[in-house]
Amino acid sequence: MPAQIKAADSYNKDKKGSITINLDDVKQGDSITNKSGVSVSIYQVASIGHDGVNISFDIASSLESTGVDVNDITTSDKNLNPAKKLTTVIDNSGISSVTKKTDSNGKVSFTDLAQGMYLVEEKDSASYGMFSPFLVAIPYMEDGQNWIYDVETYTKGVSNQQGSLEVTKALVYMDPETGKIYNLQAPKSYEEN
């Protein structure tokens, strides 16, 4: 994502925006997980400021203590780390969310959104997997000339299937003189009458 403070010569302060999220296929074993019915929430974490020349994002006062600089999101790392930090406090921030479920193609759209910075977070993966939270700016400038108010994202989900681990304990003794290893068996338990 390019720098968020840009010349605002073509900027329209009254224009609403949208965020469309497309879930990527996630392999789980030999199959692809179901992208339908995944709950996705968005939170407006910053409003937009416009001084007639430039725009900037002003983080919500309830999130100021996080130290997140929403105007310094220029790389995926600078997006991912602040987004993860914000998810740890967002539920207690007083900021309300809008939550929707993905359609059968793994797509969900949030429309008629005020300009600002939004935190996107998966709330319930259903049987999909999971994706990392991320931040989306409305608007943003991709080519250095035109503002984009309708943002479309493609997530890279990962499987949330956990592997299994089997632990086998063995009681062994190694004779220090010969180096020979002996398998020992503990006595069988018995019941007292």
Regions inferred by a protein language model and the residue ranges of each:
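Solvent-exposed loop/turn and edge beta-strand elements of beta-rich ligand-binding domains
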Residues: 1-193
